[in-house]
Amino acid sequence: WSATATRVSDDGRARFLRTAREAVASVEAHRVDKVVVVRRVVVEGAIEPRQLLDALAEESSVTRFGFSTSEHCFVGATPELLVAWDGRLVRSEAVAVTLARGRDLRELRESAKDRREHAYVVRAIHAALEGAGAIVSAVGEPEIRSLRHVRHWVTPIDGRLGADVHVLDLLRALHPTPAV
């Protein structure tokens, strides 16, 4: 696909890298349990949102999303499944810990820091689901999800909507997860 962008703004790269270093230091010093550092990239110009979503589809193990107004659109892809439902059955996924492709998977499985980080996200999602009125029935075993450039540790969490619970209640309770 091709698109023409008249300007791509990523003025925050240096700030992002500085913040990432500070976040790592805070985790290592046990001042925080988990930090996710993000940056905003703004593209101005003629880009067709559908083409962008199609390009994101090249990575099959992600959830794609998008919405638009008459003037703006927001599209993205994430390895995290926030919530899916079928009738009263619901599923979410705890996605935490990232390892670059090509690195040894034992690093991911044997790291005490990574196990703590992943367990933190699992507990947070479990608590959010129950706090919103879902009945959690199963927390699966962590598995490795391989994407084109990275791998993530993923744990499925299954449950059932309570009698008076709507799936939108779960969305409100889950977003943002500690993985976001």
Identify the residue ranges that each predicted region occupies:
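An anion-binding catalytic pocket shared by soluble metabolic enzymes
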Residues: R39-Y120, V136
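Contiguous alpha-helical scaffold segments within structured protein domains
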Residues: W1-A14, R18-R21, A25, V43-E44, ...
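Short acidic/polar active-site loop segments enriched in Thr and Asp
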Residues: D33
